[in-house]
């Protein structure tokens, strides 16, 4: 009896080996016994939800982004030409009355003009000798000068009055995000534009998304391309900043593409300031795997995002046939967009080899079991 059991041991070992082969290749998650929430569109046909475009020179040319060109900004020029600073609460004013030093604000040897000037009070006024309170908030310097001159004329013959601002403290714009020195910037008598503010903030960091800068003005957001403004001289992207404006430079985390499939290094790649081409993406992934890839099946999957719903389409797919390496010319001209997926398909022979590699352990196990059974019978 013991001898028979010993003869069965190799057979049991073989069965264990075969059983192991059916379990090992990857984990599994079964939906049996779980609550599966059925969706109304569960029976969708994915093939009908995408458009496939084989890449041709003409199509690549059509998809090429329109280059930004230098152009003027006439409306901005008019805003700057007509710009006048209006005094706000907290500003410090200096009033000079020529030939009347007793009325002129003394700066003193160790005191700055901002320390000895006239403050614009929260009630919108400042005090001045002889004439008392002067309304200043919301007025330009010329309006304040005219008011003081007219009221001083009752006490001084032909007063010569000059008014300037010693400290701008009431109005600010805010620069935040991916700049080297974020913070508030004073609105002064010198017009402050978006380009001025970025330069005053020390420029952009390496993480900045300079194509999608957000300017919030009066509660409304505007998208500004600093790339077009700074690189191409498109002044239409420049804006005049007003009190309370917020200029935000976002991170470039969303500027990424995914390279998957039969490449040597599957990667998530960040796009730099100058964008990225299909050739660059494949190069950063160390190229396609020449032993397993199907060179005629290089796809760029581009989600339609907010454009979805046009005929129920969710993505456009662009196919590059790289069987002839000359087609890399088209790949070099094909510019990727954020969240594009570059997918390199597997060659049929590679799929067959992988299937064989999966089956070989099982085939070997069955053969071993058969040989073992024959050995048992021969005993």
Curated annotation (Swiss-Prot):
GO annotation (BP), single: polysaccharide biosynthetic process
NCBIfam families: PRK15078.1
Main location: membrane
InterPro entries (alphabetical): Poly_export, Poly_export_N, SLBB_dom, Wza_C
GO cellular component labels: cell outer membrane; pore complex
PANTHER family from the UniProt entry: POLYSACCHARIDE EXPORT PROTEIN GFCE-RELATED
UniProt source species: Salmonella typhi
Family: Belongs to the BexD/CtrA/VexA family.
Function, as annotated: Probably involved in the export of the extracellular polysaccharide colanic acid from the cell to medium.
Keyword set includes Transport: yes
Keyword terms, alphabetized: Cell outer membrane, Exopolysaccharide synthesis, Ion transport, Lipoprotein, Membrane, Palmitate, Polysaccharide transport, Porin, Signal, Sugar transport, Transmembrane, Transmembrane beta strand, Transport
Signal peptide bounds: 1-20
Bilayer topology annotation: Multi-pass membrane protein
Keyword Signal: yes
Protein name: Putative polysaccharide export protein wza
PROSITE patterns from the UniProt entry: PROKAR_LIPOPROTEIN (PS51257)
Pathway participation: Glycan metabolism; exopolysaccharide biosynthesis
Cellular location(s): Cell outer membrane
Lipid addition sites, S-diacylglycerol cysteine: 21
Lipid-modified sites (N-palmitoyl cysteine): 21
Gene responsible for this protein: wza
Pfam families: Poly_export (PF02563), SLBB_2 (PF22461), Wza_C (PF18412)
GO molecular function, one term: polysaccharide transmembrane transporter activity
